[in-house]
Amino acid sequence: MSESVAIIGAGLVGCLAALAFSKEGYNVTLYDFRQDPRLDTTKNKNLKSINLAISARGIDALKSIDPDACEHILQDMIPMKGRMIHDLKGRQESQLYGLHGEAINSINRSVLNNSLLDELEKSTTELKFGHKLVKIEWTDDKQICHFAIGEDLKTPHTEKYDFVIGCDGAYSATRSQMQRKVEMDFSQEYMNLRYIELYIPPTEEFKPNYGGNFAIAPDHLHIWPRHKFMLIALANSDGSFTSTFFGSKDQISDLITSKSRVREFLIENFPDIINIMDLDDAVKRFITYPKESLVCVNCKPYDVPGGKAILLGDAAHAMVPFYGQGMNCGFEDVRILMALLKKHSGDRSRAFTEYTQTRHKDLVSITELAKRNYKEMSHDVTSKRFLLRKKLDALFSIIMKDKWIPLYTMISFRSDISYSRALERAGKQTRILKFLESLTLGMLSIGGYKLFKFLTRERS
């Protein structure tokens, strides 16, 4: 008889985990406290969704689980070969991601989530929406899951499973129940930032330029870096762009005291968007849409001994979105877990234990990198010194091949290099670049001093 598993959370990682385990013959039930997002009656489906950038780690994970489904699911993604930096005068500068035409890919979160749910409908997975996890009783036999169901989520309901997988996000109920069973180290950190979803509608005005109903180049991730705040935009397949404003809590609270203040702020700081974004709609969104917080979560261990439960995705390692790796990392979690189960011939206890032991260093690394990258996106991309270092980084990579790989390439385009290994290699490379930078500046200073002395002697 096949083992039964309850997967808590029908977001992106939960759906992929359900697909992976159903492919391996497990009896899978996927739960979510929300209603089915594919239904027209489901409210507030995408008011707080930062568009996704899926790259090598996420794509490779999808391919490893179901190559045919991967091709279908990702058919609407739009390749982005670099960042497009917009300055205060409306000028644009392209900064390519890769050395050989590599690209990350824009895809709408809701479209991807719904596509995964559609794939699950074709499998043996049972989908149960409107089920809120309340409690788990841990036993040596079955894990007893208590839910609250119904429209008001107040009717009690109980099911038993061989094991549980928590994919229920940063505020994971599964993790809370695991903390009652195991001694779990846990940390939660909020960044002093909030984000608001904005929208750039499709238009036919620039169709000759971009080959579609896009107002700006779809093959770039657009960034309006303003040091203490920024705006980004990623293309959707219908020609629209999902745009997101990031700013401090105090700044946003001060702005939204009046519509006129928001309007003036947008016109002053993002002058080139007023021709492509409905300004009235943007002001309305600033005032009425959720001002969502950004939280980082780290914990360890990720499992309950005996193979009773494991955490994947944001439930284990919520991160800020500035490296575009949250979903990619969560998908990679699933791929690595399935590989470990195969390695241990389905022995959950051994596979889950090894997952915690080997994965933790990588997850801490990418969570930290994501935090660091906000400064790069909002400030460094306008720095000549930063851009010079990036060019040197690329030059050394061309000369030295695989012996020198830029950090972004290792993270976004090389799923064969772990996050922790990428961070370690990049640290060594950065130290070399800084040394060469200091050496060059020192030589220029000495040269300048000698030239000055020579010229002053000539005059005397």
Curated annotation (Swiss-Prot):
InterPro entries: FAD-bd, FAD/NAD-bd_sf, Kynurenine_monooxygenase. The keyword Repeat does not apply. One of its GO terms (cellular component) is peroxisome. Gene3D superfamilies: FAD/NAD(P)-binding domain. Transmembrane segments: none annotated. It is an enzyme of class 1 (oxidoreductase). SUPFAM superfamilies: FAD/NAD(P)-binding domain. L-kynurenine binds at R83, Y97, N373, Y408. It comes from the Eukaryota. Pathway: Cofactor biosynthesis; NAD(+) biosynthesis; quinolinate from L-kynurenine: step 1/3. The keyword Membrane applies. FAD binds at V13, D32, F33, R34, A53, R109, L133, Y195, D314, Q325, G326, M327, N328. Changing R83A: Strongly decreases enzymatic activity. It is found in: Mitochondrion outer membrane. Pfam families: FAD_binding_3. Its cofactor is FAD. GO terms for biological process: 'de novo' NAD biosynthetic process from L-tryptophan; anthranilate metabolic process; kynurenine metabolic process; L-tryptophan catabolic process; NAD metabolic process; quinolinate biosynthetic process. It catalyses: L-kynurenine + NADPH + O2 + H(+) = 3-hydroxy-L-kynurenine + NADP(+) + H2O. Keywords: FAD, Flavoprotein, Membrane, Mitochondrion, Mitochondrion outer membrane, Monooxygenase, NADP, Oxidoreductase, Pyridine nucleotide biosynthesis. GO terms for molecular function: FAD binding; flavin adenine dinucleotide binding; kynurenine 3-monooxygenase activity; NAD(P)H oxidase H2O2-forming activity. Present with 556 molecules/cell in log phase SD medium. Catalyzes the hydroxylation of L-kynurenine (L-Kyn) to form 3-hydroxy-L-kynurenine (L-3OHKyn). Required for synthesis of quinolinic acid. Belongs to the aromatic-ring hydroxylase family. KMO subfamily. HAMAP family: Kynurenine_monooxygenase. This is Kynurenine 3-monooxygenase. It comes from Saccharomyces cerevisiae (strain ATCC 204508 / S288c).
